[in-house]
Amino acid sequence: MLLHLAATETYYQMNTFDGMKWDSWSAEVKKKWDIPMNLGEPARKAIKGNSLDYYLDALHQVREKSLAEFRKRDDKWLATVVTEEDFSANNYAKWFHVAEHESNHDGQIKFLKRRLPGAKDTSE
């Protein structure tokens, strides 16, 4: 799930900060991020065997880039509307979606953590 969040944020970085059309990224980028982005059976087979720190570090690196890029931008950039094919959205809406996406998965992560053997009841 953490790598999925990193993948989502990476794709939105390229779309909003770099001005790339959705899904126009290089084969190298797709090779690294498509499986965690799309999840499903391919992700279940490929994303395993790493320590928690591996996944946290991946998300941290992506997040640091987002924060650095946001520091370069202003409200005018947030309000900028970009149209791709039949879809229009401003950068604020795109990043609001990223935040909502993470919030949703955070709930899933908390749900799963409470069900791990030996987990303490945190009543969050």
Regions picked out by a protein language model, each given a short descriptive name:
Residues 1-38, 81-124:
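Short, contiguous alpha-helical
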Residues 35-78, 94-98:
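Acidic/histidine-rich alpha-helical segments that form the ligand environment
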